[in-house]
UniProtKB/Swiss-Prot annotation:
Gene3D superfamilies attached to this UniProt entry: 3.40.50.880, P-loop containing nucleotide triphosphate hydrolases
Species this protein is from: Polynucleobacter asymbioticus (strain DSM 18221 / CIP 109841 / QLW-P1DMWA-1)
Function recorded in the entry: Catalyzes the ATP-dependent amination of UTP to CTP with either L-glutamine or ammonia as the source of nitrogen. Regulates intracellular CTP levels through interactions with the four ribonucleotide triphosphates.
PROSITE patterns: GATASE_TYPE_1
Assembly and interaction partners: Homotetramer.
NCBIfam families for this protein: PRK05380.1, PyrG
Name of the protein this chain belongs to: CTP synthase
Activity regulation comment: Allosterically activated by GTP, when glutamine is the substrate; GTP has no effect on the reaction when ammonia is the substrate. The allosteric effector GTP functions by stabilizing the protein conformation that binds the tetrahedral intermediate(s) formed during glutamine hydrolysis. Inhibited by the product CTP, via allosteric rather than competitive inhibition.
Classification of source organism: Bacteria, Pseudomonadati, Pseudomonadota, Betaproteobacteria, Burkholderiales
Positions annotated as active site in the UniProt record: 383, 520, 522
Amino acid sequence: MTKYVFVTGGVVSSLGKGIAAASLAAILESRGLKVTLLKLDPYINVDPGTMSPLQHGEVFVTEDGAETDLDLGHYERFVSAKMRKSNNFTTGQIYESVISKERRGEYLGKTVQVIPHITNEIQAFVERGAKASHDGKADVAICEIGGTVGDIESLPFLEAARQMSLRLPLHSCAFVHLTLVPFISSAGELKTKPTQHSVQKLREIGIMPTVLLCRADRPIPNDERAKISLFSNVREEAVISVWDVDTIYKIPEMLQAQGMDDLICRELELNAKPADLSVWANLVYELANPKHEVTIGMVGKYVELTESYKSLIEALRHAGIHTHTRVNITYIDSEDIEKEGIDCLKDLDAILVPGGFGKRGTEGKIAAIRYARENQVPYLGICLGMQLAVIEFARHVANIVQANSTEFDADTESPVVALITEWLDREGRVEKRTNASDLGGTMRLGSQRCPVKPGTLAHRIYGAEVNERHRHRYEVNNTYVPKLEQSGLVISARTPNEMLPEMMELPDSMHPWFFGVQFHPEFTSTPRDGHPLFSAFIKAALIHQDATLKQVS
């Protein structure tokens, strides 16, 4: 039978519940337990797919094509289980399901209420999500509840968790509460009162924390931990200090050193072998002891909130681990390039243009791509970054001067990139869309396979086949591909059914390393295994750096 750990937050949001949940999962997995994770989001949106990256951060795409919270990216990077659509659900999905049942008459004329109908539906979603991994036989499902205790939006989720702990047999549920212990510089001390009030609020709901994770900018002294224990009614050994560190991959060792996994295993009556975190220790060592250093320029329009590119940033760091390289990322607003020119690109070892949507900032990205191509700087374009690389090549090499995307100009004379109107999804079903289709859930989503052209850079990186996750509406227009290929562009992979371009590159005779992919490889990178594309990109940056230094000397 699956046991459940509910992770809640207090005082303020963005304390790192997702990292805490993923770190606990990593420790339990190292003890031989089968672990899965769920994210319960209290917002009314059906999913984050239509939310602004500046509000929500990155949208993480699962293997089965769900647009989910970025915390699912943390989950996949910390444990071996693959997340699926059922590992993330929202208030919007819960209400949508309940209202649909009411319309079908499944409630037999009863008045539909938050308790029991909404809370029952939440519990059903939780139990369904727990069965999504490990063939439905997970030992532990760690459920992160978004928001903070006291938010009106979170109350049905907390009530559902309380009801589950009451309904299931004893020792089936544990509660981990993450809270803030701020340091007040004017007083020169840590303040525990916010944590006391947060736990009090949780207890009013009927939930007693098994473990308190106390976030601070420094380790919390034992006397302060004892004070928190006394006023929160949580045993002192279960008051765990979680302080700021330079990499999130230190968190599993930090929690395990304070016995958090033992506390959870004892509460849930789980018999498991001792934890082995040697993999995490090695990762931390590699991060702290690089042999090389490169600077990558990331040119985007959401750079003021780097959470918008969370998986991409982590993928570059993973590549650094596996190439013994410290990867410094310079974030460049593409609109600044439009206003101030390309001087900001001159000291970079490589340039990356990530995915994105909309016209704003695209000409700045195209200018950065042109700079990379003309100056032999390694370039990686992801999703929109590939589409813009094709547009730049079409304009300045293939002499298709008006080349553009119908996303930016619906009436363009040369739609080198255009809306996909029909394609097969990963299950082989025909999907169709038009300009009038809903934005939510109408993209090409999820993991899909395609063959790779022999003799290409793509083949050297990936081998004969690529299997990556997608999230896009627009695609390189096959009508223009012959002219682009005549000018030197190489389409190194296509979808097997629609023959849609999946990867493009320039031959060695034109550029040492210029590469674009329509999919999102960052979603499958992990710190343990890295990712071949990002490792190849960092190696190309090192080669370019070495060549540049030789020219200067």
